[in-house]
Amino acid sequence: AAQAISFGASAIGLVGKMPSGPGPIADELIKTIAASVPPPVATFLLTSEQTAENIVAHHERTHTNTIQIVDELLGREYGAIRSALPHVKLVQVIHVVGESSVDEAAELVDAILLDSGNPTLAVKELGGTGRRHDWKLSRKIVETCGKPVFLAGGLNPENVREAIEVVQPFGLDICSGVRTDGNLDMFKLERFFAAASR
């Protein structure tokens, strides 16, 4: 986290238990890291929980200031989360598979994050796939959504500049594109931030 912040990260994603993908860490470690991150850097809990009760419980174990919901929820769950955690920001991940990718969730959260997973598989892909999706479609979503839109999905030091120019997102979310053999690669991370800030 400290290295990412030193390179210019404005948020740190802390990955809870997931059905697939790189980087999950124990809730106790998430809590420790979140407590060490200085303001104004945001701390995002990436959770695959699908009910308000479980999401609130996950947050209470970790104490981040933002929850990134990586799977689909029923609309009523958002209201229950907001009631229980009124000062916590909610970011809904939308896996871009077509023009209908952004649904009613955009109205119920503070921001959305466009990614390239596939939640319909037997073992759900909820992020960290290293695959790009259609950035022109992502641009349409940015233009029509009315909320801040983060871009994820296959971003790396070689393509981040193009992604920014094509999509014009509010922010970027990186994972597999700055890893080597499943571990965070500081050289790739530094190159990513250098390319993104050009």
Which residues make up each language-model segment?
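Conserved N-terminal beta1-alpha1 strand-loop-helix module at the mouth
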Residues: 1-171, 176-198
